[in-house]
UniProtKB/Swiss-Prot annotation:
Record GO cellular component, one term: cytosolic large ribosomal subunit
Cleaved signal peptide residues: none
Record gene name: rplQ
Official protein name in the record: Large ribosomal subunit protein bL17
UniProt subunit comment: Part of the 50S ribosomal subunit. Contacts protein L32.
Keyword vocabulary terms for this entry: Ribonucleoprotein, Ribosomal protein
Family, similarity comment: Belongs to the bacterial ribosomal protein bL17 family.
Naturally occurring in which organism (per UniProt): Natranaerobius thermophilus (strain ATCC BAA-1301 / DSM 18059 / JW/NM-WN-LF)
Length: 113
């Protein structure tokens, strides 16, 4: 499986992506760097696809990845049914421009309505 390193080792990268994905699904919109937004988008799409299946096994699989049980409940009760007819493309990455402090390219990641 290919992925971006995000200048972190495996454990740090995994923790960062878990936390960002959980925050994104909780708030339905986050602002982060472009590289992180693209990686979180991939993971969020997989979580929403699991939520569309709505089985006990898929719920447990989402619980093993996401860090908050309330987010899993929201994912399976609100977000999953909303995208039931849609075949992928649940998220959108909007480029925002460079960050003030270090010039890192920023992006807004949001759910498609």
């Amino acid at each position: 499986m290919s992925y971006k390193k995000l200048k972190r080792n495996k454990d740090q990268r995994k923790a960062l992506l878990k936390n960002l994905t959980t925050a994104f699904l909780r708030d339905e919109k986050i602002e982060t760097t472009e590289a992180k937004a693209k990686e979180v988008s991939r993971l969020a799409e997989k979580m929403i696809t699991l939520a569309k299946k709505n089985t006990l096994a898929s719920r447990r699989q989402a619980l093993s990845y996401l860090t908050d049980e309330d987010v899993v409940t929201k994912l399976f009760e609100n977000i999953g049914p909303k995208f039931q007819e849609r075949q992928g493309g649940y998220t959108r990455v909007l480029k925002k421009g460079p960050r003030q402090g270090d010039g890192a390219p920023m992006a807004i990641l949001e759910l498609v309505e």
